[in-house]
Amino acid sequence: MSSEGRYMTWKDMSHNKFMTDRWARVSDVVSVIKQSHAMDLSKAANLSIIKTALAGLGSGWTDNNPFVSPMTRFPQTLTMYGALVLYVNLSDPEFALIMTKVSTLTDSGLADNASANVRRDVVSGNKAESSGKTAGTNENSAYTLTVSLAGLAQALRLEELMWTRDKFEDRLKLPWTPVQGRTSPPGQXQLAAARVTAHIRAAKRALLYPGDSPEWVGWKHFYPPPPYDVYDVPPLDIINAKLAADDIGGLVTPTPASSHGLPFEVSEEVEQANRNSLWLTVGLLLAALAVGIGVAAYHRKKLQSRLRELKLLWGSTGGSGGGGGFDTELYMRATDTVSLGTTLSEHAASAPSGLRHRPAATDSGPHEALPFEVWVFDNLAVVYDSIGMSDLFYTVREFVGVFNGEFEGLIELLESPDDDDGVYTNAPRDTAIDAYESQENYDRIDIETVLIERRINLKKLLLEEAELERRERDMTMIADEEQRTLLHRLESSRVEATHAVAKAEADARAAVAMAALASKEANDYDSKMAFDRSCKEQELRLRELEVNSMPSKTERYVHTGIQGGAQLAGAMAVGAMLRRGAGSSSQTVSSGANIGSRSQSLTRGRSASQPLSSVGGSTRGVNNNISNTNLVRAGNSAEVSAGRSTNSGNSNFWSKLRVGEGWSKYSVERAATRAQRAIVLPAPPSAPAG
């Protein structure tokens, strides 16, 4: 990965994942879920529509430039209204399982996409199992589409699945923005992610997250409703107004974004206040520079004047040794060095006991000069004080150290012997007093210097303490955020466990209901089988009764003979009619009448041959006629049975003897009519006289 945040080759796994994954906007996913719930999930025809809508999420996401940073591809960015537009990766395992489950659904059993309401109605018995274009229940009582949509909606509620800045940088090792030769300060990514998390949490608390607001209720389109058509999460001012209106509390204040953070939208008043403060800061800085430059120039001139006096003093040639006409002893330290780099108390001279001076060659008369070392240290103290007042202490301190090295040559020059002796006298008392006053001045300056150093050290300690407090606050904020994240995960785990327990209970109740339904079906099947067995037994019993009610073989033979004779007589009569022609119709009638009279005489003869006793005899005659009629009827039945037996054989005769109830009635009525036509009942005999 280069310094600009781009990718080197196509072999980078993070780059391939970043390019090939399915990135979808949160509001689009929620809109598809809302439309799917608005449709009838129990209809098999709606399954293809829902699958197409879910498959289209994130399919066309690209900007035709693969070598870009995540921020350029805006998986999470800000709109012109200052609101968050969030993206999720549908290729993550949490979403990939759900998308794969939905994409593999089929309507083969017309049950994969059945809704829970249909399932309850079917199990409770209020609704029969549907077929055709509607969906019923499957064997394992699983309603995959309903459960998948519910799981997808629940996954969108988790903040851990949102791709924030720190998630891109930590998980995929991708820089959020192209790095222009420098890296962002540590903690900027975490701060930006914390702002985004706080924004999302506030939106969920105010019920202004995609899918929570009333605008989503009943929304059946694939694009978001009007308040969400340009952003996913509303701006902070809308969220704060909603929280204040609901009297919830916990308002979110927009934190100023850093140079590498998210560009939060600010109001015009805040921008004007920032501009005013900037101009005020610039003015104060210019004023401080002017005062500092003036003070530094003043003390610089003062320092130059002091150095000029020293130069004039060093350049005086009063004696042959070039020592300036002074002959005195310098009260030095044990090391015989002079150092102005530490404290001025080291250079304080003790009270001189015997100092000599040479009168100056002036018109005003003799003048007693101060000791040379006291005068030099006095001037150096003034120079040191000027350096401290001009805030150039640490800078000029090195210069003073160099000056000390040059001053050693001057000390050697002063220690050289002077040829002109006897010109010095003892110093008066005033000289000692001035020396003591100089000593007090040196001590005062030394105390002030120590106080300045202590103030500087105190300021350093305060700065270090403030830095430690800031680090402690940052660590506390990070620990609180981690604690809140852990609590949220624990709550999510608890909710998932509750859902799992509820699902297990529902499955158990459904299993009990299905077992009861199966038991009911088994009982119904047993009742049906018992009814079938009873029907078959009744049928066999009826067949046995029919077989037992059949006429005997002798009766069948008599009836067959009578019927054959009747058919032969009829055939002979028809043949005679055909031979005689159309004019012999009367003869045919007469022959028929003769046949009828012959049968009547036969009947009468049979009736007369039986003994009669007054009324009882007539009754027996009627009974004989009725028995003859039954004989004819039995003969007709035997005729039908005989005709069938000739075709099917004697073995299966009784199995094919049964006919329909209507045909049996018709056969009996026809046989009775024939018997009444063929048999004429005789007139009852008259009672004997007397």
From Swiss-Prot:
GO cellular component, one term: helical viral capsid
Motif interval(s): Involved in virus transmission by the vector: 553-556
Region Disordered, annotated ranges: 583-628
Record key words, sorted: Capsid protein, Coiled coil, Helical capsid protein, Virion
InterPro entries per UniProt: TMV-like_coat, TMV-like_coat_sf
Annotated signal peptide: none
Any single biological process term in GO: viral translational frameshifting
GO molecular function, one term: structural molecule activity
Domain of life: Viruses
Family: Belongs to the virgaviridae capsid protein family.
Protein name: Capsid readthrough protein
Upper classification of the organism: Viruses, Riboviria, Orthornavirae, Kitrinoviricota, Alsuviricetes
